[in-house]
């Protein structure tokens, strides 16, 4: 009995220490002191190391059979101070981009350093919204949940190419959905009923899938301002739901080309709710809180892709690409891409309405 009480006491003190550490690191005054050009690499380095151990432990507790928690810890531990210094140097470059300068002025900021020390999304401006709170909020990007497809030439190209893309999807579905995999979140949690057939994921090209859908791949790679981090056929099973979440950063628009859309499928982005239409593009900003429902008896499938926001000039895109690569294509993202590529069964229910077939 004594050892049980002793163990309980030790665990209680350990959790208290963790809580105090997190509170200290996130205290506004402390974070403003460390999130400067000089100290930011050290602050991020320490945070990643700490969150690696904590995140791995939490993942193991929640889903022990579905989580590669050891890889999460090892990926965080593989992050070096040099990686964080590189990220700092890119942020210095971003500070000088015209679009970002305009956003900083509107928000009363002089630099992007220290932006996470206060809730920027709660400051009224054309570039913020209370329901837009990604981990990286780039100032200067208009805050709009949805956009109209007619605003983008690339969206019109995809709508014209719908028959070719749908034909290749039907071929994949005729093979019992081989190539689809259960989607794993960045925390390595499985979303039941959400399956993806990946073309690109965190910069990793899925060669076999691209070869099976050559026209779809050709069309995507020919488009301007195409962003190769998340490109896939995205399916949602009957009566499944993707809970509210936000993307990692703003400045990138998400496109969905409706391929199989039974009645009863909806998406909420910020305060607004819409549904898809087969052969039509839906464009939205995934840095807003968003969630998806499929209330039907059939699978819902869209072609899912990313494009850089039109507010950025072409000469600004290379700097933004380096920033995205610095934090998304490091050790953590390699683990996430490898997990997505791993041989893992899907739970895709290939139940397609007859009207959705395209010859």
Kindly give the residue locations of the regions a language model identified:
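Fe(II)/2-oxoglutarate
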Residues: 1-145
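Non-heme Fe(II)/2-oxoglutarate
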Residues: 74, 81, 86-220
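Short, conserved beta-strand element in jelly-roll/cupin
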Residues: 225, 235-237, 247-264
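Short beta-strand His + acidic residue motifs that chelate non-heme Fe in jelly-roll/DSBH
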Residues: 242-245, 265-267, 284, 290-296
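A short hydrophobic beta-strand segment most commonly corresponding to one strand
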Residues: 254-258, 283, 298-313
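A short beta-strand-loop-beta hairpin characteristic of the jelly-roll/cupin
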Residues: 259-278
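Conserved metal-binding segment of the jelly-roll/cupin
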Residues: 275-289
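Double-stranded beta-helix
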Residues: 304-353, 358-359
């Amino acid at each position: 009995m004594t050892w049980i009480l002793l163990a309980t006491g030790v665990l209680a003190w350990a959790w208290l220490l963790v809580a105090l550490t997190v509170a200290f690191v996130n205290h506004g005054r402390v974070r403003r002191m460390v999130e400067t050009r000089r100290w930011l690499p050290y602050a991020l380095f320490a945070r990643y190391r700490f969150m690696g151990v904590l995140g791995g432990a939490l993942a193991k507790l929640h889903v022990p059979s579905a989580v590669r928690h050891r890889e999460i810890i090892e990926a965080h531990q593989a992050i070096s101070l040099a990686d964080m210094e590189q990220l700092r140097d890119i942020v210095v470059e971003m500070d000088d981009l015209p679009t970002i300068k305009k956003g900083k002025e509107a928000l009363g900021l002089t630099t992007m350093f220290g932006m996470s020390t206060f809730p920027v999304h709660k400051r009224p401006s054309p570039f913020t919204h209370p329901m837009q709170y990604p981990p990286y909020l780039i100032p200067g990007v208009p805050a709009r949940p949805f956009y109209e497809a007619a605003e983008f030439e690339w969206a019109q190209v995809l709508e014209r190419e719908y028959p070719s893309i749908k034909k290749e999807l039907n071929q994949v579905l005729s093979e019992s959905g081989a190539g689809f995999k259960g989607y794993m979140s960045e925390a390595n949690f499985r979303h039941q009923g959400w399956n993806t057939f990946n073309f690109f994921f965190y910069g990793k090209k899925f060669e076999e899938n691209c070869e099976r859908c050559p026209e779809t791949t050709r069309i995507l790679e020919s488009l301007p301002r195409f962003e190769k981090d998340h490109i896939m056929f995205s399916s949602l099973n009957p009566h499944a739901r993707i809970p509210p979440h936000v993307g990692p950063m703003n400045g990138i628009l998400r496109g969905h080309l409706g391929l199989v859309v039974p009645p009863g499928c909806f998406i909420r982005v910020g305060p607004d709710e819409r549904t898809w239409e087969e052969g039509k593009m839906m464009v939205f900003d995934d840095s807003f809180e968003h969630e998806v429902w499929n209330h039907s008896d059939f699978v819902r499938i869209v072609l899912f892709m990313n494009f850089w926001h039109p507010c950025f000039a072409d000469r600004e895109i290379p700097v933004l690409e380096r920033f995205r690569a610095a934090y998304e294509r490091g050790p953590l993202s390699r683990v996430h891409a490898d997990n997505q590529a791993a041989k893992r069964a899907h739970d895709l229910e290939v139940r397609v309405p007859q009207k959705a077939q395209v010859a």
